[in-house]
Amino acid sequence: VATETTISPSPAILIEAHQWAELSSILSARLPGRRVWAFGSRTTGRRVKRFSDLDLLIEGESLSLREAALLDEDLDESRLPFKVDIVDLSTITPEFRARIEPEMVLVQG
């Protein structure tokens, strides 16, 4: 059963509109039907700089090696001027999740 993917039109993350358009295009193409959350300095505004990385948490089944490689390739080849770190929800500890939960912003799902 295919799941419809919803992209937040204006997430509360500190990136420019054209960067959001490019990122959301990559996410919807590579992670259809998956919930994706942003967290870290780009959601809290603390110590964020122009080239600060963007942390994304992926829900659902773990990405296959192929899926992860294609996503990484698309992000690396994008015009985004910052690194995007992908974190798989199934690999984090309950303590880490509890720490980041207050700053998580849904960007797709």
Language-model features: locations:
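Short, well-ordered beta-strand segments
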Residues: 55-57
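Catalytic core of pol beta-like nucleotidyltransferases
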Residues: 1-35, 43-50, 59-109
